[in-house]
Curated annotation (Swiss-Prot):
The gene is matK. This is Maturase K. It is found in: Plastid, Chloroplast. Keywords: Chloroplast, mRNA processing, Plastid, RNA-binding, tRNA processing. GO terms for cellular component: chloroplast. One of its GO terms (molecular function) is RNA binding. GO terms for biological process: mRNA processing; RNA splicing; tRNA processing. Belongs to the intron maturase 2 family. MatK subfamily. Usually encoded in the trnK tRNA gene intron. Probably assists in splicing its own and other chloroplast group II introns.
Amino acid sequence: MEELQGYLEKDRSRQQHFLYPLLFQEYIYAFAHDHGLNDSIFYEPVEIVGYDNKSSSVLVKRLIIRMYQQNYLINSVNYSNQNRFVGHNTYFYSHFFSQMISESFAVIVEIPFSLRLVSFPEEKEIPKCQNLRSIHSIFPFLEDKLSHLNYVSDILIPYPIHLEILVQILQCRIQDVPSLHLLRFLLHEYHNWNSLITPKKSIYVFSKENKRLFWFLYNSYVSECEFVFVFLRKQSSYLRLTSSGTFLERIQFYGKIEHLIVVYRNYFQKTLWFFTDPFMHYVRYQGKAILASKGTHLLMKKWKCYLVNLWQYYFHFWSQPHRIHINQLSNYSFYFLGYLSSVLRNPLVVRNQMLENSFLIETGIKKFDTIVPVIPLIGSLSKAKFCTVSGHPISKPVWTDLSDCDIIDRFGRICRNLSHYHSGSSKKQSLYRIKYILRLSCARTLARKHKSTVRSFLQRLGSVLLEEFFTEEEQVLSLIFPKPTPFSLHGSRRERIWYLDIIRINNLVNH
C-alpha cells in the first residue's frame, strides 16, 4: 500500500497516461489480493487447492512472467473455455490468474479517480459525513420531502449496456490507450463477460467473479448518467435568473434536448418551464431511482420523455420507457430499499371557538409511512430454504452438521439483522411473522439434527431460543420509550427508528 501511495505521489500528471505498466508490478497484485479477493464484506473468499499466503508472491511472479509471453491472455482464455473439465488444478490456476488480472486492472483504473481524494491538502480536508453513508439516512430525507410532493417516478436504470459504451465513458478520464484496449479484451473475450449483466434480475446483479472491475464499470456508468442529469437540472434552475440575452446563446443547446428550435423570446419560458421545478428530488440506490416532484402529471411525463431521449441518444441504446412508472403519491406505494413506502393522509378534526359560536374544521395531515413487505421477504426466506413459498417453516439440512450453539447463533444473527434493518417500519406485525418463521425453522433444524420432535426442543430450549430472537432493536426501544409496553409476539409498536450504521442492504432484502 505504501509503494502504491508513493507511486501516486511521484508524478500525478503522468498517471492517466501510463497506467498499463503497473500490471507488471508485484505490489499491485498483492494490493488487489489483500483488499479485494479476501474481503469478507464485498467479495466471496477464494479457496485454491494447495494455496496459502506464503505462496502468493510465487503465484504473482509466475503470472507476471507469463504475461510477458506473447498472446498469453488470449491463449489462457481460450484454454479456460475449451478445457474447463480437463485438468482441474490447471484450469483452476488459469482461472485464478485471469481473475487476478481483472482485479488488479480494476485497482489500476481506479488510480485517476483516487487522485481526487489525495490531491486535497490536509488543511482542506473534506469533512467526514459518516451518518450520510448509512442507507437509513435516505428515509429521514424522504420523510421530510415526500409529504409535500404530488407525483413520483419509479425508475429502473435501463439495461443492457453496450460494452463499448462502458469503454467510452472511461475514455473521457483515462487517456492510456493500452489500458483501454485491455479493458475491451476483458469485456469481450473472458468467458464470464456475458454474465456482467443478468437481464432476468435487476441491473446491479453481477457475476460473483471479478466483482471489483464490474462494480467499477457500473458505478462509472451510473455516475455518467447522473452527471448529465444533474448538470441539466442545475442549468435549468439557472435559466430563471438569466437575462433574455443569455437565452439566445442557449437556444441550440436546449433545442438538441427537446428537438425544438425556438425563435421568439416570449416562448422561452413556455418551452423550458418544466426544467425549472424547484421541488424536484432524486434518490437512487444501485439500479433503482426515485424522482419526485410537486408539479403536475404533465411535468412528470416530460421528464420521462427527457430521460428516455437522454439514454437513447447519449448512450445509444433503447431505454425501455416502461421501466419508468409515474404515479400520484396519494394513491401509490413504491418499493424501495426493502420497504413499502407511501404518503398517507390522516384526517384531523379541529374545533374552532369564536366568541359564542363554535364549529368544526376538517383537515388532513400528510405523513410518510413505511412498512415491511411480507410477501417479498417470505419469498427470500423460501429461496434461502428457511420456509416454503407459502411461509411454512422448514428445517435447514445443510446446517445440521454444526453445533447447537452455532445453529442458534446463525438463526439469531439473521433475525437480529432483519430486525435492525426493518426498525423503521410503522407496523411490526409482519416483522414478527418473519421472526416466527426463523424461530420455528431453527427449532426444526435442531430437531432434525437430534432426530427428535419440535415440541420437545421448544420445551427444552424455549427460553434460550426466545432470548436469541429478542432483538437488540427492541432493547433500544425500551430505553428510548419508557412507556411499559410488553414485547409480545403479536405486538403493535409503531415507533420507527432509523439507524446510521447500516452501509449495505441485507441479502435477504435484496432478493
